[in-house]
Structures are given as C-alpha cells and as structure tokens.
Design a protein with these regions (language model features):
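Short acidic-hydrophobic, aromatic-tinged amphipathic segments that line or gate anion-handling sites
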Residues: 56, 115-118, 209
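Non-catalytic C-terminal accessory region of glycerolipid acyltransferases
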Residues: 126-236
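Canonical alpha-helical transmembrane segments
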Residues: 45-54
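Active-site phosphate/pyrophosphate- and oxyanion-stabilizing loops and adjacent acidic/basic residues
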Residues: 44, 81, 164-165
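Catalytic core of membrane glycerolipid acyltransferases/transacylases, capturing the structured
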Residues: 17-40, 48-49, 63-122
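Membrane-interfacial terminal anchoring regions of lipid-handling membrane enzymes
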Residues: 1-26, 33, 37, 60-63, ...
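Generic preference for hydrophobic
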Residues: 56, 70, 93-94, 201-203
Length: 236
C-alpha cells in the first residue's frame, strides 16, 4: 500500500510540476530555467518521498562554465532524476521515441528541446547524431545512455559508439558519469517496489576530443566505458 501511495504521489507531483513548468515557459520563454527546475525542485522532492539519499562526487573535476556531452550508465527510470539533481546545468537527454506516448512527459520533453531516437529505424541514428552535434554547437548540455537500455542486473553493458560521434563533430569534451544505487531504489521490473537507499552519482574527468591525441569514435567510446566502469568499482 505504501508503495502505491508513493507511486501516486510521484505521478501527481510530476504531472503538476510539468504543468507549472509549461506555464512558466509560456511566460518566460526560458527552456533552460525549466530544466534547472528538475534539479532544484522535482528531483529532491521525489527522492525524499522515496526515502533515498543522493551523494554526488566529483563535481570539482568539471568546469561548469563549458558545455559537454555527458555519458552515463543506465540502471532505472529514476536515472534522469538523479542526473538532474547531480549536474548543475540545464540538462537535455536523448530519449527513446516511446516517451512521446507518455502524457505530460512528452509535452515537457518537446518544450525543453529533448532529442528522440526511434530504435527501430536504421536511419534514425544518423539523424540524431546530427541533431545532437547541432545542440552541442549551440552550447547546450546533452546526456546520453550509450548502453542503449537499462541494465537489469546493474552490471555495465557495452557502449554503442555511434552517438558519441556527436561530441567529436561538435568539438566538445565528454564527461563520464557513473550511477550507483538507482537500480536498487527502483529496480527495472519494480514499478511498485520503491525502496529506501543511497544513490551515488560519480562524475569523472572530462575526455578531450580535439588535439594531437584526439581519439576516434571507437577509442572515445572505449575511454568513456572504461571511466564509467572504474567509477562503479567497489570502494574500500
């Protein structure tokens, strides 16, 4: 019963917050402000309601006056919430196209300039790469889940190389981010089983994509995967 109440609160609070954000956007025309609301209003309330504590490590490694392509592992549907909370920038995501069918969420995602990928289309990848590179050239912040799906076991899956090409095309650094604990607070198959716990968000050192030692797409993908994997290793 408690989990059902948590779910009802989460859905109601999210829907209400989105409506408020859309009204604010109509007044201010400031999509970045709407995105920042995810970090200072939506995420903290939802985590408190879930009994989850979020610990952020590594913010000092990043110059937040610049824009980046962030790449993160994917454990749970609350990963986006954790990233909004941890990264102090107006963050846009690449979402699967199925999210366009979710009421309220689709309105917010479109209004804030999120990108969408049709995973069943062979041509979609090239189009999204161009869109992502264009977004990064505009100075926006973008986050990808290069595993392509949520990990059911929590183990890090291989990264798909294609979309990291956007960082090379735009000349922006890639910041690896490791999420640890999201899958325990809200498991992949546990929509009604929210559990209290600790979520750690570890932010890695930016990876350069320009200069004499600049990596190609495959090398960049391997470096990002290795960095995330290292941050997921148990700490003594």
């Amino acid at each position: 019963v408690f989990n059902l109440l948590q779910l009802a609160f989460t859905l109601a609070f999210t829907a209400g917050g989105i409506v408020y954000a859309l009204v604010l956007l109509a007044i201010t025309r400031d999509a970045d402000r709407m995105l920042r609301m995810g970090g200072w209003m939506w995420s903290p309330v939802l985590f408190r309601g879930a009994g989850a504590k979020v610990i952020v490590e590594g913010r000092e490694r990043v110059d937040w006056s610049k824009n980046y392509l962030f790449v993160s592992n994917h454990q749970s549907i609350i990963d986006i919430c954790a990233l909004f909370y941890a990264l102090p920038v107006p963050l846009r995501f690449l979402l699967k196209e199925e999210m366009l069918k979710v009421p309220f969420v689709n309105w917010y995602a479109r209004a804030t300039g999120m990108l969408f990928l049709d995973r069943d289309s062979r041509r979609a990848g090239a189009l999204v790469r161009r869109q992502a590179a264009a977004l990064l050239r505009e100075g926006k912040q973008l986050c990808l889940f290069p595993e392509g799906t949520r990990s059911r076991t929590g183990a890090l899956l291989p990264f798909k190389a294609g979309l990291l090409q956007a960082a090379i095309d735009a000349g922006v650094q890639v910041v690896p981010v490791a999420l640890d604990g999201c899958g325990k607070v809200l498991p992949v198959d546990g929509l009604f089983r929210v559990r209290p716990g600790i979520i750690r968000v570890r932010i890695g050192t930016p990876i350069a994509v320009t200069g004499p030692d600049a990596p190609d797409r495959q090398q960049l993908t391997e470096q990002a995967h290795k960095a995330v994997a290292a941050m997921l290793q148990p700490r003594i």
